């Protein structure tokens, strides 16, 4: 008989967990002496995903996983897009509320040349959002590759599953994390 991770058995340390990232992002969480509020934008959601993995790795050994990374983060792409539209409202003085929930086929950075009016403003907001998602995914990868964990005495032993969300927002997460 083989007892997996027998050397950790006396410590009663837990091993391997999948993180309910949606609960953490929607409700915030407390770790040690600090706490966080719910995420409202993609940058915060990506950082909280990283902190969640790191915090658990410091308390247990074994792999840490986020089973539906793109699915959990997708709503924060839309929230960030809406924030960009609100910034444009402040800048232009125009009412752009109809763009908040307008259907978006894909979040792709495209040139603004030739676009006018709301189409130009919408694409500008999409471009800014794609850049924010890219930066958030890049930060997630850098953080996961450099954060040290006490429990595993290594960088966080982690995995993320993606390809679980086919929405425009989910595809944006996947595309940007793979770049």
Question: Language-model features: where?
Answer:
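Catalytic alpha/beta active-site cores
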Residues: 1-179
